Amino acid sequence: MPLAAAQDLRAYNLQTASVARTGADLLRLLTAGFTAKAPSIEPIHAQLSAKWAGEPAAGKLIRAALVLCADHELNASTFTVRCVASTRATPYGAVMAGLAALQGPRHGGQTARVAALFDEVAAADSPEAAVAARMRRGERLPGFGHILYPDGDPRCQLLRRLLTTALGSNPELAMAVELAAAATENTGLQPNVDFSLVMLQRSLNLPETAPMGIFAIGRCAGWIAHAQEQYAHPELIRPRARYVGEQPQLARD
């Protein structure tokens, strides 16, 4: 991406139409990174499905997941993108900053921890046993709970319904449903979007990189829209901070 940014002089044009063109190029480039193919104008969900899946229903399900990941107001990565865009960095710079934030284990990188939990469940006697083992060790259950959705993440709920309708009796999906039920019963926490992306990956037998790939590509579309909006405002995003630590000792003669 840095190499493409250096060669794309149009990216320095921050007018709305130009940012839209650059954003489309960025989405194709990011998709190419996950498909290991040249950038293409084919629909993104079709590219990912052709590379990743053999399941006929995969394309529509991947498309739904991309849409569900596209925007979620001012999460950490999107706020980062808007801050960078406010400096008048190019869309490449804004998106690369967003990707850096997204990969953190408390953001999109959480999907790797959810995948590890799924592996534990697959190796355990039952989902309940895996949940109990985590709880006895005093460990969190990744993929559960969201500060905005104490009653359940609607993105996860929708993707689960779509998977159930499309796949019916799928063993990986059944395991995910049992895991969610066991975790919610014992913690009161509902599964979130990170859980649903791993549930999708396991149910469709997609590669391990798929959850993060879908999250990053889907969210990139939202980042471009946020950057477009930010470029239209002249203000630099500059929050203030107030020092609340110990006061330095005054020097004595």
Task: Describe the predicted segments one by one.
Residues 1-253:
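Hydrophobic alpha-helical bundle cores within soluble ligand-binding/oligomerization subdomains
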